[in-house]
Amino acid sequence: MRSNLCHPLKNQLPISFFLSGTIRKPIFSCSRLSISAIITKEQTQEESESKSKKEVAFSSSSSFDFKAYMIGKANSVNKALEDAVLVREPLKIHESMRYSLLAGGKRVRPMLCIAACELFGGTESVAMPSACAVEMIHTMSLMHDDLPCMDNDDLRRGKPTNHKVFGEDVAVLAGDALLAFAFEHIATATKGVSSERIVRVVGELAKCIGSEGLVAGQVVDVCSEGIADVGLEHLEFIHIHKTAALLEGSVVLGAIVGGANDEQISKLRKFARCIGLLFQVVDDILDVTKSSQELGKTAGKDLVADKVTYPKLLGIDKSREFAEKLNREAQEQLAEFDPEKAAPLIALANYIAYRDN
């Protein structure tokens, strides 16, 4: 059994559906430490557990100005996205693409990509095409997730969802266009990186969003609706793939274009896997503790849809405890790197853990 949760999956978890009229709960076999094992595991670091959130959040680098870093990187990403996706013919499809892509958002994935690149001596400009690509794909996933055939949501980033403004047909096509353009942008806009590493970036990104990544998580999520006995390992499978995979890809892409070696990339994968799950745990907590106005999207929708979430299975307190564990384990993966260069990644992990929306 592995000693921690966040090792990347060498082999995807086996999953079986029985499609004779109804879909039954997926059956998993997994040798690694599960969420339930972590949650019920006897505490061995009571002193660490008693730290306040504030102490944990700022123990990494008191001199690092994360607010300034976040504003600066978000502005750079927003400008790069606006320059990449221009208004051109056909107007409607490009307006739809830009409507969702430029609607704001935290830009966490692009920042992770840039920070990972800079950790290994790369520059923002080297990472930016990959950073923009992951944000394009993230936006596509939100556009498709909001459709009536999926979550049927009306609000995203404080604005009407794309299909409410442009119609379902255009929203689907605009999402498809963003997906395709993401790969084109990496291939044509990345400068100062070897062709071998660019090919590796394309393969990495494709895998993390396909049938072994984001799509896998989404289809299991959709097929799990109405199943009463969904457990923690089932939920973990969904979110490792649906949420964590693209966050992992964001970090790994940055590491690749930044010049990291395989051992360093492996460390960053483990870090990213932890913060990917962390992102979802916090999302689930916020969904039941914040309003739609505070979140900028429909609050409580998982509860209404009777979806399984971490608070539903663990309760709010245990979910928060699990989030703390994931954050600590994520930061442990960065212990061997230069603290000054790792400060943005540590700060981003803390931001994900303690965000309010």
Curated annotation (Swiss-Prot):
Gene3D superfamilies: Farnesyl Diphosphate Synthase. One of its GO terms (biological process) is carotenoid biosynthetic process. Its cofactor is Mg(2+). GO terms for cellular component: chloroplast. Isopentenyl diphosphate binds at K106, R109, H138, R157. Pathway: Isoprenoid biosynthesis; farnesyl diphosphate biosynthesis; farnesyl diphosphate from geranyl diphosphate and isopentenyl diphosphate: step 1/1; Isoprenoid biosynthesis; geranyl diphosphate biosynthesis; geranyl diphosphate from dimethylallyl diphosphate and isopentenyl diphosphate: step 1/1; Isoprenoid biosynthesis; geranylgeranyl diphosphate biosynthesis; geranylgeranyl diphosphate from farnesyl diphosphate and isopentenyl diphosphate: step 1/1. Its EC number is 2.5.1.-, 2.5.1.1, 2.5.1.29, 2.5.1.10. Signal peptide: none annotated. Mg(2+) 2 binds at D145, D151. Dimethylallyl diphosphate binds at R156, K242, T243, Q280, K297, K307. It holds the Pfam family polyprenyl_synt. GO terms for molecular function: (2E,6E)-farnesyl diphosphate synthase activity; dimethylallyltranstransferase activity; geranylgeranyl diphosphate synthase activity; metal ion binding. Binds 2 Mg(2+) ions per subunit. Residues 1-40 form a transit peptide. Its main location: plastid. It is an enzyme of class 2 (transferase). It is found in: Plastid, Chloroplast. Keywords: Carotenoid biosynthesis, Chloroplast, Isoprene biosynthesis, Magnesium, Metal-binding, Plastid, Transferase, Transit peptide. The keyword Lyase does not apply. Mg(2+) 1 binds at D145, D151. Catalyzes the trans-addition of the three molecules of IPP onto DMAPP to form geranylgeranyl pyrophosphate. This is Geranylgeranyl pyrophosphate synthase, chloroplastic. It comes from Catharanthus roseus.
